[in-house]
UniProtKB/Swiss-Prot annotation:
Residue ranges annotated for the Helicase ATP-binding domain, each copy included: 49-235
Protein origin, superkingdom: Eukaryota
MF terms in GO: ATP binding; ATP hydrolysis activity; RNA binding; RNA helicase activity
Entry binding sites for ATP: 62-69
GO cellular component annotations of the record: cytosol; nucleolus
Source organism (scientific name): Vanderwaltozyma polyspora (strain ATCC 22028 / DSM 70294 / BCRC 21397 / CBS 2163 / NBRC 10782 / NRRL Y-8283 / UCD 57-17)
Top class in the EC scheme: hydrolase
EC number, as in UniProt: 3.6.4.13
Swiss-Prot/TrEMBL catalytic activity: ATP + H2O = ADP + phosphate + H(+)
Record gene name: DBP9
Region of interest (Disordered), residue spans: 340-373, 521-540, 561-597
Acidic residues: bias regions: 340-354
Stated name of the protein: ATP-dependent RNA helicase DBP9
Amino acid sequence: MSSSEVLAPEAYIDDSISFESLQLDTRLLQAIKRNGFKNPTLIQSHAIPLALQEKRDIIAKAATGCGKTLAYLIPVIQTILDYKKTNTDKIDGTSNTLGIILVPTRELAQQVNDVLDKMILYCSNDIRSLNISSDMPSSVLTSLLLEKPEIIIATPGKLMTLLDTNVESVSLEELKFLVIDEVDLVLTFGYKEDLSKIAEYLPLKKNLQTFLMSATLNDDIQELKKEFCRAPAILKFNDDEISKDKNKLIQYYVKTSEFDKFLLCYVIFKLGLIKGKTLIFVNNIDRGYRLKLVLEQFGIKSCILNSELPANSRQHIVDQFNKNVYHLLIATDDTEYIKEEDEENDDEIETNSEEQDKVEDSNDTKDKKGKKASKIKKDKEFGVSRGVDFQNVACVLNFDLPTTAKSYVHRIGRTARAGKTGTAISFVVPLKEFGKHKPSMYQSTKRDEKILSRIIKQQSKLGLELQPYSFDTKQIEGFRYRMEDGFRAVTQVAIREARVKELKDELLASEKLKRHFEENPQELQSLRHDKELHPSRVQQHLKRVPDYLLPAEAREGKKKVGFVPFHSVKKSNRHKKNNKVFKKRSGSKSDPLKNFK
């Protein structure tokens, strides 16, 4: 439950208990009620009493959208409020940091911070929070830390930097709570060493409670359990328990060639075959810009979300997408390539443990060479397939199939949330079609069929099914020559120019105008991220679809207006008489040349 607008599906709700029965502070209960939460979810009804009454460390494994955020925020807030009541003599304006929340990405840090602000609305005088995950000058950070926030939200890397360079500004002697959210993703991002170093600064031997929240439980998490936890309570909420809610997600896969991916996208979005907002996932930043530029050729607007863009711009794009400003978002999900493991070992892990998904990555040298050409710095603390709260997504389109079954689960988890229906469509390139069209080729598609079989196997364990889907080729073929023209105009040079142009525009909006937008928030709404880049030549005629290409039922009925003469056939008698008189008068006149003397 990441915001007040998005409530957990009914399948997650625990009707047998209410928030009032959890003995929470009245101010916290008032904030919970204000945000529309009536009953806790399953994970909340189990975790909150264990944390508050029994003071247990907690390791929780639960699916996306089950209310994990509030499951740890409520105990943290309640514990701090209780501490303030019982230790009024220690509070002299120099309060200590009482809670630390670690998350893998900046986007998730901002999301948690937003939820926290809503929960401490009526106790903001007693609890202050600070999100240090965003880039800010050290002088600004130091001044913010002088306010002594009770809760600090950060990525492990940012917190480690703070402790190394400015540890005197943070007092951790009375730390009560440590939360590590999305633990498996934190470890995938390579923060294991940072966590070990952070542990040296924490009062682990005192009464420090730890929350480890994760989608999977693997050996790495077991190591963190030994390092951070003492006799923890382990909560597991399997997908089987909420499978009745999963039938709201319909999954399709389409076997197609590499070039036909672009053709199908053109047809789908130009003819409006998908109603509602669509989230498109690609595996590479260049792929995202190529798809955007190709769609621009046909007048289809979209916006880009990737790790190159400034953090402020990324957050603004997500916010506007959630407010329905954009309906088509192309997101680059390249975080799955950070951690590389042997595929065979992953297969063994899958057979030995049903709780742990396979983690496999592409070791293709060609893909690495392609990445070598990009000199623009990426933000390693960026993740889009997990954590980011995309609201009311009608369809998730895997333009590029993810390289792991685990990543597939997280991608499709962006739709069919909060009890709503959703559709997931995945393009799969058969091995026999791989490499036939060099300009549209991407190396990871070589393994699409293998990945698809693993995805189908994984989903079948959950009682879910991926259905094959095929388009009417006769209807699609009519659009092919137009796609060939549009695709030909999007060259590699055009893609590079588009990346540079987009980055310059977003940096300008993010840095130079940041203060202006803070003073004039109404003008921020007019800042758009789906403007046409078109460094490539845009052919205007491609933006309109001729009627003869449309299916019969989609063609606009033409009105039969009949023959339209240049002059009106019907004339009044008055006009006829006037014409006759004029002709007589003009005819009676003599020719001046003949009568000239």
